């Protein structure tokens, strides 16, 4: 009975999302309601006589504030990230349109550097929008553009300044840097497999990549992955993708375009908000005196097992500040930008709140542990092989690393402990696979089809795109097999 009650909310969410008839918000609210009812029932049943009501009240008093606090960290970046993007849209820099010659070097920069950079600093598909715009400038459209545009999501474990990784780390009992470092190692085989598929997609788009350029692509991919790992090790996880992609993008621009002074100045003006944001985030995390000043300044930490919130150190402060400056300099109507932000951010914020609260109650009520024990009893150590499938399903259905981690991380880390496996690596598999599979979520694919005005059916789109699921899934299964062999 305990296992069935514990599973019902998860199964309900998966069934609702898989049906395609309800949104992630409706599924999240239904899952939260079912979780609250199931956790209250189990806590009352386990409490001594006449003490059930008090136990349920204590559970709610403990988990609701904790869930709201963890949600706030995500929502603060959701709202400010959308505001930053809308501010740049309002800026409407002249001269950003027009087509340019398509070359393999420009295609690589757009797919693996420019678009992932945009996704890492704002998230929520913004990188995909920028990727499609860049591909159209290269004269690539239709289904090939949709497939290549999905590479904007190739560093999503660090997307939106790593909010999904931060949520996953908190629920797994790790620091964000610890989880980010493990995910950076898993991203190496994932990215190399992505690269092999990219060459095929580029050829199908009419832009075959010669051997010399493939070697060049490999070298830059190795450099990118090495820098992502290094930044995870030496700095904060929030900039682990933003800083390397920005640095390499500037380096590639200088090498490939050899711009004159006027062209370089025009490019700098067009990208000034992103340059300012990257410099601000890097300075506050790499310049020791500045970091030591801002990190404790007015910091709030109401829960010992949850991250602190330092308002002047948080990425959202810089997204908001630079976004406001962009609006004021462009003399755009601030009220309109705020209204567009509210319309664009409220749903993602509500989805995050529902799934994070659901996760808190799964942990606090013991339901995650109950499911893990049941899986161990039913499948033994082989139950661990289900983790990549759970993670892939969560990422595909929700389209959000934060939401999928909130839904699944408590159960999977509990399973790791029940099987005497390393919970940190189990958390890394969950986070890496679920984040990478968000690129194939119906939310992303339908967005690309709408922007490109594709008339092809979903079946046709997924028949071409499904190989992109293989790199994270194969890596996830391989990692679990290594964990089982070492245990």
Where are these regions (language model features)?
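Hydrophobic alpha-helical transmembrane segments of multi-pass integral membrane proteins
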Residues: 103-133, 143, 157, 352-357, ...
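Membrane-interfacial loop-to-helix junctions in multi-pass transporters
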Residues: 3, 97-110, 138-144, 343-350, ...
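Transmembrane helical segments that form the transport core of multi-pass membrane transport proteins
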Residues: 244, 249-252, 259-394
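Juxtamembrane boundary at the C-terminal end of a transmembrane helix
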Residues: 479-487
């Amino acid at each position: 009975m305990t296992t069935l009650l514990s599973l019902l909310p998860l199964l309900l969410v998966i069934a609702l999302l898989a049906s395609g008839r309800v949104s992630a918000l409706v599924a999240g609210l239904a899952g939260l309601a079912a979780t609250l009812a199931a956790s209250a029932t189990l806590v009352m049943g386990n409490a001594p006589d006449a003490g059930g009501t008090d136990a349920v009240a204590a559970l709610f008093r403990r988990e609701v504030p904790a869930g709201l606090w963890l949600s706030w960290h995500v929502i603060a970046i959701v709202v400010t990230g959308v505001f930053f993007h809308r501010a740049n849209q309002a800026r409407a820099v002249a001269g950003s349109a027009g087509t340019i010659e398509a070359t393999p070097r420009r295609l690589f920069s757009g797919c693996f550097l420019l678009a992932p950079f945009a996704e890492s600093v704002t998230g929520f598909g913004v990188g995909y929008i920028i990727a499609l715009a860049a591909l159209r400038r290269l004269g690539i459209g239709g289904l090939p553009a949709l497939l290549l545009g999905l590479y904007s999501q190739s560093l999503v474990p660090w997307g939106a300044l790593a909010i999904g990784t931060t949520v996953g780390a908190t629920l797994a009992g790790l620091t964000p840097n610890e989880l980010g470092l493990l995910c950076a190692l898993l991203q190496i085989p994932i990215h190399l497999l992505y690269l092999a598929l990219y060459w095929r997609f580029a050829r199908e788009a009419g832009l075959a990549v010669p051997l010399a350029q493939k070697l060049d692509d490999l070298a830059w991919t190795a450099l990118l992955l090495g820098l992502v790992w290094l930044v995870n090790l030496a700095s904060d996880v929030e900039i682990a993708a933003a800083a390397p992609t920005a640095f390499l993008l500037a380096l590639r621009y200088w090498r490939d375009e050899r711009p004159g002074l006027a062209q370089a100045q025009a490019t700098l003006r067009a990208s000034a908000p992103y340059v300012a944001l990257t410099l601000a985030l890097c300075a506050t995390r790499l310049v020791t005196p500045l970091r030591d000043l801002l990190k404790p300044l007015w910091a709030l930490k109401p829960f010992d097992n949850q991250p602190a919130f330092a308002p002047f150190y948080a990425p959202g402060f810089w997204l908001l500040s630079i976004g406001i400056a962009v609006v004021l300099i462009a003399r755009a109507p601030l009220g309109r930008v705020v209204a567009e932000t509210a319309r664009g951010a409220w749903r993602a914020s509500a989805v995050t709140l529902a799934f994070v609260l659901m996760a808190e109650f799964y942990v606090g009520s013991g339901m995650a542990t109950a499911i893990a024990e049941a899986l161990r009893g039913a499948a033994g150590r082989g139950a661990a092989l289900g983790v990549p499938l759970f993670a892939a399903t969560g990422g595909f259905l929700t389209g959000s690393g934060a939401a999928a981690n909130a839904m699944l991380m408590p159960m999977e880390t509990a399973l790791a402990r029940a099987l005497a496996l390393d919970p940190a690596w189990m958390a890394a598999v969950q986070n890496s696979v679920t984040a990478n599979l968000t690129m194939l979520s119906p939310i992303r694919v339908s967005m690309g089809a709408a922007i490109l005005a594709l008339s092809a059916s979903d079946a046709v789109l997924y028949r071409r795109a499904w190989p992109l699921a293989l790199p994270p899934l194969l890596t996830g299964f391989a990692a679990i097999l290594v964990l089982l062999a070492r245990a």
